[in-house]
Amino acid sequence: MRKIYQRVLLKLSGEALMGSLGYGIDPAVVQGIAQEVAEVAATGIQIAIVVGGGNIFRGVKAASKGMDRATADYVGMIATVMNAITLQDALEQVGVPTRVQTAIAMQELAEPYIRRRAIRHLEKGRVVVFGAGSGNPFFTTDTTAALRAAEIEAEVIFKATKVDGVYDSDPHKNQEAKRYESLSYGEVLTLDLRVMDSTAIALCKENNIPIIVFNLSVSGNICKAVMGEKIGTIVGGFHESKRS
């Protein structure tokens, strides 16, 4: 495979890891992700991953039912670490050296997040999985993905979802839903498309980091996306300058 990127960030939602299960982690899904990441890493592309925790706990949902929001968000951060360690194990079982770095210190389980160390791991060919979000309540893991991408100077964010791009309405509920091939950051916000939250979009725009949204459930899509094949929807980047 011919690589077009040097360093990328893959954003995985917690829900993506549970596959067809109603809760938790589907081992087959995690193993499939690990195999695809291994294929990409073998080409020399540097890969960092930010993983969510919604398959185990959702802070916003818990807060809506009376739990203190900050406390709920911290519990959600711990859930992301559970996913990160699971992903690390799956990657190492297929021969990919992997490090987990967390924004909240958990020295018995993972390294603390240190930007320079993360970059050094990437340069050595290791996959780095970021857990515990940004370490701050009230911020989503999408915002964490944008932040970490900017910090490690990733060229692009690949956001893995359950649909093949960004639509003007829910394609599961509306058969007439239209899929966008490309969007500007401004269009995402103006049309309220919820690709990522507004803070994440603002960070990507400020740092000119394109976002490619694609369907994780299709086997081979991680490789296709990272190798530059046209799939899903691209937000910002080259398409942003064309619309300005």
Swiss-Prot record:
Q: Where is it localised?
A: Cytoplasm
Residues the entry annotates as binding ATP: 11-14, 54, 58, 161, 167, 170
Enzyme class, one word?
Answer: transferase
- Originating organism: Trichodesmium erythraeum (strain IMS101)
Give residues annotated as binding UMP.
53, 73, 134-141
Against NCBIfam families, the record matches this protein to: pyrH_bact
This protein's GO CC annotations: cytoplasm
Which residue intervals make up region (Involved in allosteric activation by GTP)?
19-24
InterPro entries noted in UniProt: AceGlu_kinase-like_sf, Asp/Glu/Uridylate_kinase, Uridylate_kinase, Uridylate_kinase_bac
- Pathway listed: Pyrimidine metabolism; CTP biosynthesis via de novo pathway; UDP from UMP (UMPK route): step 1/1
EC id: 2.7.4.22
Q: Matching Pfam families, A to Z?
A: AA_kinase (PF00696)
The main place the protein resides is cytoplasm
> What's known about how it's activated or inhibited?
Allosterically activated by GTP. Inhibited by UTP.
Keywords on this record? Allosteric enzyme, ATP-binding, Cytoplasm, Kinase, Nucleotide-binding, Pyrimidine biosynthesis, Transferase
GO BP: 'de novo' CTP biosynthetic process; UDP biosynthetic process
- Supply the PANTHER family for this chain: URIDYLATE KINASE (PTHR42833), URIDYLATE KINASE PUMPKIN, CHLOROPLASTIC (PTHR42833:SF4)
Q: How does it assemble?
A: Homohexamer.
The major lineage groups are: Bacteria, Bacillati, Cyanobacteriota, Cyanophyceae, Oscillatoriophycideae
Reactions catalysed according to its record: UMP + ATP = UDP + ADP
**Parts of the chain that traverse the membrane:** none
Its recorded name reads Uridylate kinase
Citing just one GO molecular function, the answer is: UMP kinase activity
**What role does it play?**
Catalyzes the reversible phosphorylation of UMP to UDP.
Tell me the superkingdom of the source: Bacteria
Q: Which family does it belong to?
A: Belongs to the UMP kinase family.
